[in-house]
């Protein structure tokens, strides 16, 4: 398993998909067709709802800090947009590419994977925050 990020609150192993979670809370689904073939979904803040940021550390497989990434989310609370803790609605926009929506695991490491451009799965599991 590849460990990607750590955050600030959390709970047990769970799985969700973008199609299930996008559009909850203050997020709305956005569908984009790439090269007339591939379809990519991500979430964006609804009009009038402020986007907020949080900086988190990305860890390697040995729980050592690699770097920091900035996550953006909608609304006042980080849990907005995801209906089950420990997830928080976020989109990773630091690459400069189109934002990718996921619900991240607070205070626990998580693994993000996707089977195709329409179905995203995110799995949370318990772990320590890297220093």
Curated annotation (Swiss-Prot):
The cysteine framework is C-C-C-C-C-C-C-C-C. Keywords: Disulfide bond, Ion channel impairing toxin, Neurotoxin, Secreted, Signal, Toxin. GO terms for cellular component: extracellular region. GO terms for molecular function: ion channel regulator activity; toxin activity. Expressed by the venom duct. Coiled coil: none annotated. Contains 4 disulfide bonds. Its main location: secreted. This is Conotoxin Cal8.1. Residues 1-19 form the signal peptide.
């Amino acid at each position: 398993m590849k460990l990607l990020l750590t955050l600030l609150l959390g709970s047990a192993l769970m799985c969700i998909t973008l199609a299930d979670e996008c559009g909850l809370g203050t997020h709305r689904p956005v569908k984009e067709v790439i090269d007339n073939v591939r379809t990519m979904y991500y979430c964006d803040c609804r009009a009038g709802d402020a986007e907020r940021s949080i900086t988190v550390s990305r860890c390697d497989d040995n729980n050592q800090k690699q770097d920091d990434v900035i996550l953006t989310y909608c609304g006042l609370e980080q849990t907005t947009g995801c209906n089950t803790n420990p997830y928080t609605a976020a989109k990773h926009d630091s690459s400069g590419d189109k934002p990718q929506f996921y619900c991240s695991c607070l205070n626990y490491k998580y693994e993000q994977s996707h089977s195709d451009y329409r179905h995203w799965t995110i799995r949370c599991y318990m772990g320590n925050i890297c220093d």
